[in-house]
Amino acid sequence: MPKIVDHDQRRLELVDATWRIIAKLGMEGATMREIAEEAGFANGALKPYFPTKDLLLTSAFGHVFNRTNQRIATMTEGLSGVAALRAFCAEVLPLDEERVNEARIVIPFWQKALNDADMAALHSESMSQWHTTITAHCAAARAAGEIATPIGDAAVADHLLNMMLGAQIVVALSPAEHFSQDLAGQLDNYLALLAG
């Protein structure tokens, strides 16, 4: 009897392997051969699922973004205002090994997105979603009296996005120098400034 292959599961295994290779070896080290070996498949097994490396890399970024969004949804459930803002940001900031590895994936993705319209569009869509959500949390915090700053909610969302993405770069380049407590403290200090 022939073996039944779950193609969605196989794609996910390949994307997970890509994620691990990029985190370990960087974008240039993420060859189709390395990815296949990491996933435990023959090199040719990737082609039916991802005909090109760029498609696989784009899927890996999408996977990281989806994982982050799943964590954000879980951690912000039932929260509003500043508590929701803090929980959202804490899931993006590189506060543990998993999130540092995610930073190691998105940074080379940004480099590729500079010259690839599809990757740039994926990034733009992702950041637009985050900006919309952060702005809504800011508006809820302002309505609850938790934010008093005259800076508008969209501008606060810009600040928080820049802080989170910048922290990913800094920690990926020198993780030993930036402990999670420092980043969490910086976030708390910024949120305290918004109160007034």
Feature roles, as predicted:
Residues 1-9, 150:
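N-terminal intrinsically disordered/low-complexity leader segments
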Residues 62-68:
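Short, basic, alpha-helical segments at the C-terminal edge of helix-turn-helix-like DNA-binding modules
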Residues 24-28, 99, 144:
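Short coil/turn segments at alpha/beta junctions that flank glycine-rich nucleotide-binding fingerprints
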Residues 84, 97-120, 169:
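Amphipathic alpha-helical segments used for helix-helix packing
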Residues 120-124, 128, 142-190, 194:
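Hydrophobic/aromatic-rich alpha-helical bundle segments in the mid-to-C-terminal region
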Residues 59, 73-103, 153-160:
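Hydrophobic alpha-helical connector segments
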